[in-house]
Design a protein with these regions (language model features):
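Beta-propeller domains
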Residues: 30-53
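Short loop/turn segments that connect beta-strands within beta-propeller blades
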Residues: 49-54, 96-100, 180-185
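Conserved beta-propeller blade repeats
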Residues: 12-27, 63-81, 102, 109-125, ...
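A short helix->beta-strand "capping" segment at the edge of beta-propeller domains
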Residues: 1-15, 56, 187-193, 199-201
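Short C-terminal beta-strands that terminate individual repeats in beta-propeller domains
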Residues: 58-60, 105
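Predominantly five- to eight-bladed beta-propeller fold
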Residues: 42-43, 129-182, 187, 191-193
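Hydrophobic beta-strand positions in blades of beta-propellers and related beta-sheet-rich domains
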Residues: 45-47, 92-94, 176-178
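Short glycine/acidic-enriched loop and turn motifs that connect beta-strands
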Residues: 33-37, 83-87, 131-134
């Protein structure tokens, strides 16, 4: 026996909130194995029967890690976000829980997160942080490339910026997209042209929302 150390606490595996299958028999949970070097940190999805009749088994394993699992209404597919095969930002993938490789659904330059299945299982609702003034995917892609090509990464603020917990937010705003889970489908920005309600922020500036946006399908 020994005293708990800083390393024990920091390097302990961390679990995300479980995603229950529609029949309640299975739970998928994200398991993050921390590391002092962020590049060595691993986050994968595991599945376990809710009655405890069998040990958990790993569903995914990739260097980029996976997160935000969501079951399809019929319980045969799992949507999640990940960076795979050269993805520069997280995209939505769909995995058949009966076997096979995960398939990429989204290819947005601004990435995708928080996927939600439509009641019929044919489409996914998700969030992407778009650039101000960009009305199309091509414009968002150009803005993302321009930012990537910069030879500097300093940020200059002339007033106190919006802060979300432990990181500074940039000028992008969350928008809501829908896309069919089918080959060659395209994402549609449901909030395009919508003016977000502004609220007072730090230093008297105005902010429109945060990095979080919540949405749900009607039955």
């Amino acid at each position: 026996r020994r005293a708990i150390t800083h390393e024990d606490v920091w390097l302990a595996a961390r679990l995300s909130a479980p995603a229950l299958s529609p029949d309640g028999k299975w739970a998928v949970v994200g398991v993050t194995e921390p590391a002092y070097d962020d590049k060595q940190q691993v986050s994968d999805l595991w599945i376990v029967p809710t009655d405890g009749s069998a040990p958990a088994r790993r569903l995914t394993s990739s260097p980029g890690g996976e997160a935000s699992p969501a079951w399809s209404p019929d319980g045969t597919r799992l949507a999640f976000t990940a960076r795979r095969d050269g993805d520069e930002v997280s995209q939505v993938y769909v995995l058949d829980t009966r076997g096979g490789e995960a398939q990429r659904v989204t290819t947005l330059a601004t990435g995708a997160r928080s996927p939600r299945w439509s009641p019929d299982g044919n489409s996914l609702l998700f969030v992407s942080d778009v650039y101000p003034g960009a009305k199309t995917e091509a414009e968002n892609k150009a803005a993302a490339q321009e930012r990537k090509n910069r030879k500097w990464n300093a940020r200059v603020f002339d007033s106190f910026p919006i802060r979300d917990w432990d990181r500074w937010l940039d000028d992008r705003q969350p928008s809501l997209f829908v896309q069919a889970v089918a080959p060659d489908s395209a994402a549609k920005d449901l909030l395009a042209g919508t003016t977000l309600a502004a609220h007072p922020g730090f230093g008297g500036s105005l902010g429109a929302g945060s990095e979080n946006i919540t949405a749900a399908w009607t039955p």
